[in-house]
């Protein structure tokens, strides 16, 4: 089968084409299929960039939705939602890509080239992983980069955008390629396509790109994390960067309204509330300790002590159970009601509560465990039901 001519490599801004079907293969299970064309504007998935979407229109007016595009041995196959009889080899079709989808991918991909090139210049970082996702671009670097280093690289990358330099596509000869310094993620056979962004990057790439860096709009690093000896970045460009800025501004406005603070004072307000929370938490810790002491003092030395208190977190349950064991050699149980049932902590000073915990979990749909002298968990029963079970089975 003849190879498919790649119109998208000749002009990434071309949105339509008139083509001839080379082959059509049905999918018997779904009724859909795939179509190979002699030439196409549809970019096939590859190099970290998703495939184009759009439509193929047959001469009789039937419109087929293009759901995915892949290249196999130089032939580009278009996965379509239906494969009528008219979609046969030799038939003409009119292709049209989803331009908004394509331009978004162009902005993300060109922005990734700019940032990758800058990171390589500044830190010697290689791009060891790249994918244009539906929400952000994921980039993995080969070396660690500090937050301040990323801030400087982001600024340098955006300066390239502001300069609005041309994005150049070239096909160097073997001799020219041997003398060229360029980035490449893998060994490439055959003709190499070089994407050059003056001042930023020279890279082997088969993807679609903007004509100038200004069309990228903006490059914004949303997040970074240490990953396999380097950093993994979450990046957005163009319209996505604008949407991210608008969303962050809206969230900041919501937070400011809740805190009765101006936008530039939300961090100060949050710190103030955090300090107040820390002080209240310390006070609460002390008051709980006093309450636990009082409950322990009301417990006879050899009696079972089953106490239910609302609002206890796991640490509070543990503290209460331990305090009760200091007052009695009997079974000690701290219980608190939860949305889904009861949180519990069982303890015995000189005994083993694991068998009792296992029985409780089995009987009351619970989960939990621990050491011989103390076990903790939760179950799908009320505190009253748990207390009744413990009184009936406390000899386990």
Label for each model-derived stretch:
Residues 1-396:
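A glycine- and charged-residue-rich anion-binding loop/surface
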